[in-house]
From Swiss-Prot:
<dbReference type="InterPro" id="IPR016155">
    <property type="entry name" value="Mopterin_synth/thiamin_S_b"/>
</dbReference>
<dbReference type="GO" id="GO:0030366">
    <property type="term" value="F:molybdopterin synthase activity"/>
</dbReference>
<comment type="subunit">
    <text>Heterotetramer; composed of 2 small (MOCS2A) and 2 large (MOCS2B) subunits.</text>
</comment>
<dbReference type="GO" id="GO:1990133">
    <property type="term" value="C:molybdopterin adenylyltransferase complex"/>
</dbReference>
<feature type="modified residue" description="Glycyl adenylate; alternate">
    <location>
        <position position="91"/>
    </location>
</feature>
<dbReference type="GO" id="GO:0006777">
    <property type="term" value="P:Mo-molybdopterin cofactor biosynthetic process"/>
</dbReference>
<comment type="pathway">
    <text>Cofactor biosynthesis; molybdopterin biosynthesis.</text>
</comment>
<keyword id="KW-0597">Phosphoprotein</keyword>
<comment type="similarity">
    <text>Belongs to the MoaD family. MOCS2A subfamily.</text>
</comment>
<dbReference type="GO" id="GO:0032324">
    <property type="term" value="P:molybdopterin cofactor biosynthetic process"/>
</dbReference>
<dbReference type="InterPro" id="IPR003749">
    <property type="entry name" value="ThiS/MoaD-like"/>
</dbReference>
<dbReference type="InterPro" id="IPR028887">
    <property type="entry name" value="MOCS2A_euk"/>
</dbReference>
<feature type="modified residue" description="1-thioglycine; alternate">
    <location>
        <position position="91"/>
    </location>
</feature>
<dbReference type="GO" id="GO:1990140">
    <property type="term" value="C:molybdopterin synthase complex"/>
</dbReference>
<dbReference type="InterPro" id="IPR012675">
    <property type="entry name" value="Beta-grasp_dom_sf"/>
</dbReference>
<keyword id="KW-0963">Cytoplasm</keyword>
<protein>
    <recommendedName>
        <fullName>Molybdopterin synthase sulfur carrier subunit</fullName>
    </recommendedName>
</protein>
Length: 91
């Protein structure tokens, strides 16, 4: 079975209790939040709604509630790395 790595930072790591985990690939990018919500109930609203997502070394838009992001056709492939990056504040 092919897998991809997902990296959790800050509040995403705290919520999941993990820094990284492997998930089955391929996975449509548009299904990522629903997949994580099934594993970690409440994460979508409490954490993911304000996070950025990177696939490899590029940020990607992931829009929910039926809106279009232009990334609906992207597939997360085996060996890919995804990062969940909460907002960063600076002073």
């Amino acid at each position: 079975m092919s897998t991809f790595q997902i990296h959790y930072f800050a509040s995403a790591s705290t919520y999941t209790g993990r820094n990284t985990e492997s998930l089955p690939a391929p996975l449509p990018l548009s299904s990522l939040f629903d997949t994580l919500e099934a594993k970690y109930p409440g994460i979508k609203e409490k954490v993911l709604s304000s996070c950025s997502i990177s696939l490899g070394d590029e940020y990607v838009d992931l829009v929910s509630d039926g809106e279009k992001s232009g990334n609906e056709g992207l597939l997360i492939q085996g060996g890919d790395e995804v990062a969940i990056i909460p907002p960063v504040s600076s002073g």
